[in-house]
Every structure is written in structure tokens, then in C-alpha cells.
Amino acid sequence: MPALFSPIRFGTLELANRIVIPPMCMYSAEDGCATDWHLMHYGNLAQSGAGLLVLEATAVEARGRISRYDLGLWNDAQVQALRPVLAHIRRHSPDRE
């Protein structure tokens, strides 16, 4: 089996394979909140079978954004909007952690 499809361990984290989906700025958030678009986009990527999926740029304060359409985590509404997206990713990812 090629190494690309072999599990790999980083400390206590074990990935099902060595395929990584890097972060891509999608500029689709509304007021820093994830939307149904994020649920569909990341849900599809999670189902790809990649061992690691890295989310896009996510600002921890409004003035740290690179665009007004970035995801944010500086208020409770943004955290709540991202929860279903992360749950969907976990449900459909190969490692489900």
C-alpha cells in the first residue's frame, strides 16, 4: 500500500491516511457566522476520505479578519453557528474525532 494511504501518528493523534485538505479562504460567512454553505462545503470535503481537513481562516476578533466575509469566533453567535458544521465534519470524517 502506498504511504499516502497509510495511517500516520502525530503524538496522540492518528490519521487514517496522509491526505490533507489545506485551509482555503472561502469568504462566505455572514457577520463572521458559518452558514448552510459552510455545512455543505465542509460536509462534502469531510466525505472525501482525507485524513485531515483544516478549516479556513477564522478570526478571533473583528479587526483581525482579512475580509469582512471571514469566519469569526469573537462572539457567542459565531460559536453557535460553527457547531453544526463541526459536528457534520466529525460525523462524516474517516477518524470521527
Where are these regions (language model features)?
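Flavin-dependent oxidoreductase catalytic cores
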Residues: M1-E97
